[in-house]
A protein has these predicted regions:
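Residue-level detector of transmembrane insertion/anchoring sites
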Residues: 37-38, 116, 165, 271
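N-terminal, intrinsically disordered, polar/charged segments of Gram-positive cell-envelope systems
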Residues: 44-118
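A short glycine-rich beta-strand->turn/loop micro-motif centered on a GG-aromatic cluster
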Residues: 150-153, 304-318
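Active-site beta->alpha N-cap acidic-glycine motif
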Residues: 93-191, 196-209, 299, 315
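Hydrophobic alpha-helical membrane context
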Residues: 35-36, 138, 187, 293
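Gram-positive cell-envelope targeting signals
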Residues: 1-70, 300
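Catalytic domains of cell-wall/extracellular-matrix polysaccharide-remodeling enzymes
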Residues: 181-279, 283-299, 305, 319-323
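A cross-domain feature marking catalytic cores of carbohydrate-active enzymes
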Residues: 125-127, 151-154, 174-176, 214-217, ...
Length: 323
């Protein structure tokens, strides 16, 4: 082989070696590129998963946050349904009585016939609710005064006022459903049937049957003799045996009869006991009572009296039974 041919062969071999090296480099570069692409894809997939997971967690938190008010609302609804069992704790308005034990409980005594040293007017309003009840509530709000409503079913279209009064912190008592002397005093059973009827209506409004009652005409009424001799002597004992307490009064506005506003004020402000259970009416037609209330309240408040609603520990006025 000539020197030229040998040199040419060497050159060809060199070119082949260089070409092989170049191919290897390209192959390595391709492998690296593929690895980089795979790594990028893996990072993208992982990032996408992380984003989705974060979004999922965020949505769960948002959903939980949205549900919290609903849960609170549900809890409030449950509390309202059991209002007669437990309510008004902690920062409860001191002028509103603790009503957790106001439901009738046979065998549990209610009230005391001993007056407290505190100067208190227990304003009581009979024979409502009616078209006058809202005006009475507005006046009580204005003077931050609490009262007790001995309600009947004579005007059932106003029964929502029972809950309205209760929600404002006033006490609800029962005065029989019909307030019909001939009906309620026909017999002991007749009285309790009528009382149960008003109890059912009150329970529908405030969630329980209260232990506070007032007899039509008071326990000392004599009209009951016309229907059943001796019935009041039986009833005053039987209502207490069944867990109720009956409330008469030791002060009256005299609005059971037709009186002017001035006459009502003069009569209602003539009492000076430490504890005054004051009889008034919020029934239909008692507009003069509504007009007299501001002056009555102002009079007693100026003398240091507080207007409170009856509760289980309040003073109880009992008249002498005449039948």
């Amino acid at each position: 082989m000539s020197d030229r041919e040998e040199k040419t062969g060497k050159n060809d071999n060199g070119k082949k070696n260089k070409g092989g090296k170049r191919n290897k480099i390209v192959a390595i570069e391709m492998i690296i590129l593929v690895l980089l692409i795979m790594t990028a894809v893996a990072i993208f997939i992982q990032r996408d998963k992380s984003v989705k997971e974060a979004a999922k967690i965020h949505n769960q938190k948002a959903k939980k946050t949205e549900q919290t008010p609903q849960a609170a609302q549900k809890e409030n609804e449950i509390e309202e349904e059991t209002e007669g069992t437990e309510e008004e704790t902690g920062d409860r308005d001191a002028s509103v009585p603790d009503r957790s034990n106001f439901a009738v409980q046979p065998g549990v005594p209610v009230g005391t016939t001993e007056q407290s040293d505190e100067k208190i007017v227990y304003l009581t309003l009979d024979d409502g609710p009616s078209d006058n009840t809202q005006a009475v509530l507005d006046i009580l709000d204005k003077y931050n005064a609490k009262a007790t409503f001995f309600v009947t079913g004579e005007m059932p279209e106003y029964k929502d006022m029972i809950k309205a009064a209760y929600d404002k912190g006033h006490t609800i008592g029962m005065h029989t459903y019909s307030h019909d002397y001939a009906k309620v005093y026909a017999s002991v059973d007749a009285y309790f049937q009528d009382l149960d009827q008003i109890g059912q209506m009150v329970q529908e409004e405030i969630g329980y049957v209260p232990c506070f009652i007032r007899f039509p005409g008071g326990s000392s009424n004599t009209v009951s003799k016309k229907y059943t001799a001796g019935i009041m002597s039986t009833l005053v004992q039987e209502v207490q045996n069944r867990g109720y307490q009956y409330y008469d009064w030791n002060g009256s506005s005299g609005d059971g009869s037709v009186r002017t506003t001035e006459e009502l004020v003069a009569q209602a402000t003539s009492f000076d006991s430490n504890n005054i259970i004051l009889l008034c009416h919020d029934s239909h037609g008692k507009q003069t009572t509504v007009e007299a209330l501001p002056q009555i309240i102002e009079h007693y408040q100026s003398l240091g009296y507080t207007f409170k609603a009856l509760d289980r520990d309040s003073f109880v006025a009992h008249h002498g039974v005449n039948n």
